[in-house]
UniProtKB/Swiss-Prot annotation:
Major enzyme class: transferase
UniProt binding sites for S-adenosyl-L-methionine: T169, G190, D211, N256
Chief location bin: cytoplasm
Gene (name only): prmA
Identification of the protein by name: Ribosomal protein L11 methyltransferase
One of the record's GO molecular function terms: protein-lysine N-methyltransferase activity
Presence of the UniProt keyword GTP-binding in the record: no
Origin species: Helicobacter hepaticus (strain ATCC 51449 / 3B1)
GO biological process, one term: methylation
């Protein structure tokens, strides 16, 4: 066993999932994953028919089957960083102590397999391909520069903040590509990675952006620097939290956010959008399309776009 291998340990407690999870994290100092399994007789039969699964302390299959969400805990630990036998003994001791403290039966079953390490970073990078949306070519920093005559945007995907691959982001980029926003004021609500703000800067707009998520603001700042553009203002919060010096009205507002929040912000959009300005709404599932259109019936519809079950709307006052 060496650093080129790791242990994959799958543990299925009969109960007390949170307590088992806390113990495993403290014991290994490693991240864990959860896998929810189907609480069906056939699935549990597969577990117990497989000789690689071991039952400890009379693991109660009936109790596990009746739990609301049977869950397996998966931990991956470098082989040279743990004595697997010591770990299992400590886990069994923990289960015994938990049983004594709760006056309940506590058992678990487990499956252990030694696996070879995999270059997850390279595999991840290989899975992220550049994408073309309207006038824009979006690529991660490890991809080569584009040779065609597109406006290039560099985004290193992080979390779920927008990299151009999702339909809702792509439709916003396509709408912006069709517009002349040179010199116009634009507000990006829920800016996420900053991809729409960066695109708008490259189209010559004076860009203001906000997001309620602190991590999104951090990612946006990183990507702004990566692309060599400058926003007029970027703040954590919503429209109502605009900093001093921000426009009272915007020529363009773009909001790629969930439908529920779109409805909540209706009055803010109406207050902040200039007369004859353009409001782009995206992040709307097709099933909520008419609900949003009804909520914004005091706006005039300029265009709609549908892609992969998602909808984007272009509106004006």
């Amino acid at each position: 066993m060496d650093k080129q291998t790791y242990w994959e340990i799958i543990i299925h407690p009969s109960d007390f999932l949170d307590q088992f999870t806390d113990f495993i994290i403290q014991k290994t100092s490693c991240a864990i994953e959860f896998f929810d399994i189907l609480p069906t007789p056939s699935h549990f039969a597969i577990i117990y028919d497989d000789a690689s699964w071991q039952s400890v302390l009379g693991f109660d299959i009936l109790k596990a089957k009746k739990s609301k969400q049977p869950t397996q805990i998966v931990s991956r630990i470098a082989s040279n960083e743990i004595n697997i036998q010591d770990f299992l003994e400590s886990l069994q001791h923990f289960a015994l102590m938990l049983a004594q403290n709760t006056q309940d039966s506590v058992g678990f079953c487990y499956h252990i397999e030694e696996k070879f390490n995999y270059d997850w970073i390279k595999a991840y990078q290989d899975s992220i391909e550049p994408v073309q949306c309207g006038r824009f070519y979006i690529r991660p920093s490890w991809e080569q520069e584009v040779k065609e005559s597109y406006d290039e945007i560099i985004i290193n995907p992080a979390f779920a903040f927008g990299s151009g691959h999702h339909a809702s982001t792509a439709m916003c980029l396509e709408f912006l590509s069709e517009m002349n926003i040179q010199g116009k004021t634009l507000l990006d609500v829920g800016c996420g990675s900053g991809i729409l703000s960066i695109a708008s800067c490259k189209l010559g707009a004076q860009v203001y952006a906000c997001d309620t998520d602190e991590n999104a603001i951090k990612e946006c700042n990183k990507n702004i620097l990566l692309n060599g553009v400058m926003l007029n203002a970027l703040w954590q919060g919503s429209i109502a939290d605009s900093p001093m010096g921000a426009p009272q009205k915007y020529d363009v507002i773009v909001a790629n956010i969930v439908a529920f929040i779109v409805k909540v912000l209706h009055n803010d959009f109406r207050t902040k959008l200039a007369k004859n300005g353009v409001l782009i709404l995206s992040g709307i599932l097709d099933e909520y399309k008419f609900d949003i259109i009804k909520a914004f019936n005091d706006f005039d519809m300029l265009d709609t776009c549908c892609k992969d079950g998602w909808v984007a709307l272009k509106l004006t006052l």
